[in-house]
């Protein structure tokens, strides 16, 4: 063998078997940035049709977590696939930089504004802190192989973006959607500020559940409503009973609310202390049961409408409150009578407005009752629950109480219970200019993926309250408005003033607002009557208006609107909604054409990531150990529309899949050794049939892969890629061609035909991989022949190219078409089982020691005969003869194909030292006593002729 070793076409490539990604990827990254890969993509795609995926900004605080990695990798895969599809798809990453979490981090270092540092100094410290956080997260994202405008990202704290946020506020005000109101809003007493809907999370909490008596102010008037005749009125005090789980709100009670069409019953409680109580008829038994009242009877009935405006005594204050009517009253639980405190609940506020009730708010921003609050001044509301219960007992107003566990709103930052508290705030009104209906209409014009996203956001928009956009914070974009000191009306020239302020902020940042001398801008006369608003904007407003402040403003987008928003499914109540509402308020349309959502990352058992459980998978750990391409392949392998599971075992499976794909690519590259596409490509019509079949399988795979990318169905991309590499190539084609590739005449037709197929296929394969396994695709690209099929130099990067258009397939009308090769593969699979049995029975060693006789029915025999002597190369045996089924020998074995029996014989022929086939002519050729005639031809002669395989 040693004398013929140099005549073999042994595979050779600089592309290593082991990825060693953790070490190699940072080196590739360095080259990408030194050679400005992102800039090269932009240049290559200039003037193409645009695709804009607008980045939802992560918050500039802390290290990135696995959820961030999932989100950014999905975006990067989609953008790279769009680039390969011929789109100009710029990616400008963003960061959300204002708000409370940053304030809290800075407070730990320098104290609260106004103590050790001025408000201006505090804002500057916040800006510095946020900038540092952005840089840290940026490097982590780049390490994942995310390409984008990293040198010029958008940050909501950039002066120009802050100015554009102010301009967006002005546009919304100009369109009639801004509202100043004294309304109950979600309020965190730890933040000391209002919260947006998206900043509220629900957790279980134990509260006091109480039934409270409100005595009738005029018993006779109440009894008359129940139509009771004299002598049949019953005995004891008359009370209406409310149920609540927030006793601390009772000081702000200003009414009891009933439903107009509900039936209410006046119940006579019997015993030593008789009394008469009013509750909804449907709930009477449950009220009596929990109060432990066994002896009672009904005195009379009335509807809620009958009782409207009847007066009842407040349980511990000296004033009376009316019975009012509201549609929000249900019989799901409680008493059918709702305690109504307009200052502490949105429904209470709304119904209170209809009746002109006082909006009492006895609670300060820190959650403590104000000094003039009778009985409870200075107490924190949640601690005051016990005090309220004691007062109710003293007054004889407490019918029943027990501990009650229920879902309750909490601050997402502090994880503490929040309250509803009426305060003067600025709102984007959903009603006053028809914004809600406009938004619901706009939703219908958007493609939501998954499709349940549409009904989800429709329900949220339909039921949401006014959007409270004001915050009482230091680090935020100011609500840059001037209001009249007495009437609180906006300055009549607000539109012009907002633009002037925006221009100042564009030069100096938000501090310009606080430094602004009102008289300089308004003139002395107006300055005497108007004052600056000192509130800041909700950070959801900051990020929500980036469709205008960033997408419309950045020249990279060339005036194009966003095609896609892609975030976690929680953003239906967050960024998707704030973006939608602000865009409709500003432009009358949605800010996006498509919205794609992904689920949350959980562990292998479906549990949320938790440090206490110890199941947190950090993306930095994965890249340092396995490499970013493994993480990227994990992301693409999942059905990301639901929960996405990750664990060491799951990542190991991704690493195994990666190795199979890498090894397939390596086989292609190693067998292109010595191949020059400019001179060595064989014309399609002259190629060996099996090689054309392989290119055709690549074409079919490419069509499915491109479609899956277009549908954002990434796990289908990975499945098709794996099937192509492992089954179509690995289990069949690559196995069959090894003999021809290694032993055919070097540079001869048989080898070059095979190399032509391998070259075309790897040209396609590297592009399929590029969006997902970006580092490995780049590595493959650099190991490929420097010239392309047309003789032109290869692009420096695969990412600047488009899907390979040089693939071709077999025509269905051909004799050896796809159906033919499908049948051949089935025969090969059946034969392999018999060869395996023969090996196990020690009849043969390897398959090349076998000679086969295939007894086949006429149809199959004619197909097999078309391959002639080349059938043995497909079956990997030294001989394969086809005979009619009628001549079947006793030694022939049945297969799992009808009409096919196979006899396996051990060859008696000598083994060729060069190709290892056993043929009768080994040792018969002068000067070449150890090799077969085929090898002699491949070494010294014209080379063997292959037509089929």
From Swiss-Prot:
Question: Where is it localised?
Answer: Cytoplasm
Q: Which residues bind L-isoleucyl-5'-AMP?
A: 567
Q: Which GO terms describe its biological process?
A: isoleucyl-tRNA aminoacylation
Is Transit peptide there in the keyword field?
no
Motif 'HIGH' region: positions: 58-68
Instruction: List positions binding ATP.
Output: 611
Q: What does this protein do?
A: Catalyzes the attachment of isoleucine to tRNA(Ile). As IleRS can inadvertently accommodate and process structurally similar amino acids such as valine, to avoid such errors it has two additional distinct tRNA(Ile)-dependent editing activities. One activity is designated as 'pretransfer' editing and involves the hydrolysis of activated Val-AMP. The other activity is designated 'posttransfer' editing and involves deacylation of mischarged Val-tRNA(Ile).
List the NCBIfam families hit by this protein, alphabetically.
ileS
Q: What is this protein called?
A: Isoleucine--tRNA ligase
Q: List the source organism.
A: Vibrio cholerae serotype O1 (strain ATCC 39315 / El Tor Inaba N16961)
């Amino acid at each position: 063998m040693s004398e013929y070793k140099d005549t073999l076409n042994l595979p050779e490539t600089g592309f290593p078997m082991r990825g060693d990604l953790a070490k190699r990827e940072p080196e590739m990254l360095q080259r990408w940035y030194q050679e400005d890969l992102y800039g090269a993509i932009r240049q290559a795609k200039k003037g193409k049709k645009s695709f804009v995926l607008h980045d939802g900004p992560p918050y500039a605080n802390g290290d990135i977590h696995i959820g961030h990695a999932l989100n950014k990798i999905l975006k990067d895969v989609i953008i790279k696939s769009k680039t390969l599809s011929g789109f100009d798809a710029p990616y400008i990453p963003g960061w959300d930089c204002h708000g409370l979490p940053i304030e809290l981090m800075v407070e730990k270092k320098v104290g609260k504004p106004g103590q050790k540092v001025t408000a201006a100094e505090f804002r500057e410290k916040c800006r510095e802190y946020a900038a540092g956080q952005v840089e840290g997260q940026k490097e982590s994202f780049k390490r994942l192989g995310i390409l984008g405008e990293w040198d010029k990202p958008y940050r909501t704290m950039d002066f120009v973006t802050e100015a554009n946020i102010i301009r967006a506020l002005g546009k919304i005000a100009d369109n009639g959607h801004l509202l100043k109101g004294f309304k109950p809003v979600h309020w965190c007493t730890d933040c000391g500020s209002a919260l947006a809907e998206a900043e509220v999370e629900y957790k279980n909490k134990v509260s006091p559940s109480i039934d409270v008596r409100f005595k009738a102010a005029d018993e006779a008037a109440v009894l008359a409503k129940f139509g009771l005749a004299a002598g049949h009125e019953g005995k004891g005090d008359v009370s209406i009973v409310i149920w609540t789980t927030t006793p601390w709100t009772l000081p702000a009670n200003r009414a009891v609310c009933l439903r107009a069409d509900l039936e209410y019953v006046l119940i006579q409680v019997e015993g030593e202390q008789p009394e008469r109580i009013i509750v909804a008829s449907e709930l009477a038994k449950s009220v009596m049961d929990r109060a432990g009242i066994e002896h009672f009877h009904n005195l009379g009935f009335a509807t809620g409408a009958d009782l409207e405006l009847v007066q009842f005594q407040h349980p511990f204050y000296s004033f009376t409150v009316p019975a009012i009517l509201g549609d929000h009253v249900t019989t799901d639980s409680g008493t059918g009578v709702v305690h109504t405190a307009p200052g502490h609940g949105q429904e209470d506020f709304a119904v209170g407005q209809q009746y002109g009730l006082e909006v009492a708010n006895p609670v300060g921003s820190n959650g403590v009752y104000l000094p003039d609050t009778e009985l409870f001044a200075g107490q924190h509301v949640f601690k005051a629950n016990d005090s309220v219960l004691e007062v109710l007992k003293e007054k004889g107003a407490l019918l029943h109480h027990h501990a009650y566990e229920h879902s309750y709103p909490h601050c997402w930052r502090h994880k503490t219970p929040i309250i509803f508290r009426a305060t003067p705030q600025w709102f984007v009104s959903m009603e006053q200019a028809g914004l809600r209906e406009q938004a619901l209409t706009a939703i219908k014009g958007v493609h939501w993926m998954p499709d349940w996203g549409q009904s989800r956001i429709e329900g949220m928009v339909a039921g949401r309250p006014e959007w409270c956009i004001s915050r009482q914070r230091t680090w935020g974009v100011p609500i840059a408005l001037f209001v009249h000191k007495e009437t609180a009306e906006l300055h009549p020239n607000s539109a012009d003033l907002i633009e002037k302020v925006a221009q100042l902020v564009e030069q100096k940042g938000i501090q310009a607002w606080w430094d602004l001398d009102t008289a300089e801008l308004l003139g002395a006369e107006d300055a005497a009557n108007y004052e600056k608003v000192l509130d800041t904007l909700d950070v959801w407003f900051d990020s929500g208006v980036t469709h205008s402040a960033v997408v419309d403003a950045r020249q990279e987008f060339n005036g194009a609107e966003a095609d896609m928003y892609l975030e976690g499914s929680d953003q239906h109540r967050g960024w998707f909604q704030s973006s939608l509402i602000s865009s409709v308020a500003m432009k009358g349309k949605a800010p996006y054409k498509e919205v794609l959502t992904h689920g949350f990352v959980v562990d292998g058992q479906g549990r949320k990531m938790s440090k206490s459980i110890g199941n947190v998978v950090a993306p930095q750990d994965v890249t340092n150990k396995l490499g970013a391409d493994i993480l990227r392949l994990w992301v693409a392998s999942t059905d990301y529309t639901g929960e996405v599971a990750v664990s060491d075992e799951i990542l190991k499976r991704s690493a195994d899949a990666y190795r199979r794909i890498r090894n397939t690519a390596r086989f292609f590259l190693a067998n292109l050794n010595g191949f020059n596409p400019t001179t060595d490509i064989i014309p399609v019509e002259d190629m060996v049939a099996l090689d054309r079949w392989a290119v055709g399988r690549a074409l079919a795979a490419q069509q499915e892969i491109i479609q899956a990318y277009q549908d954002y169905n990434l796990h289908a991309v990975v499945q098709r890629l794996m099937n192509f590499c492992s089954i179509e190539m690995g289990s069949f084609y690559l196995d069959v061609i090894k003999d021809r590739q290694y032993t055919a005449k070097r540079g001869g037709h048989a080898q070059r035909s095979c190399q032509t197929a391998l070259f075309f296929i790897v040209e396609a394969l590297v592009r399929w991989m590029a969006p997902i396994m970006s580092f490995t695709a780049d590595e493959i690209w650099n190991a490929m022949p420097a010239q392309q099929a047309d003789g032109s130099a290869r692009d420096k990067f695969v990412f600047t190219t488009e899907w390979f258009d040089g693939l071709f397939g077999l025509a269905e009308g051909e004799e050896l078409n796809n159906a033919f090769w499908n049948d051949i593969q089935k025969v090969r699979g059946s034969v392999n089982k018999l060869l395996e049995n023969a090996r196990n029975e020690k009849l043969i060693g390897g398959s090349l020691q076998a000679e086969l006789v295939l007894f086949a029915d006429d149809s199959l025999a004619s197909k097999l005969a078309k391959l002639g002597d080349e059938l043995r190369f497909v079956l990997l045996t030294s001989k394969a003869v086809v005979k009619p089924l009628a001549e079947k020998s006793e030694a022939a074995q049945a297969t799992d194909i009808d009409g096919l029996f196979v006899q396996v014989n051990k060859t008696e022929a000598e083994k060729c030292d060069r190709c290892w086939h056993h043929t009768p002519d080994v040792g018969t050729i002068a000067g070449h006593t150890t090799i077969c005639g085929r090898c002699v031809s491949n070494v010294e002669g014209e080379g063997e002729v292959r037509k089929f395989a």
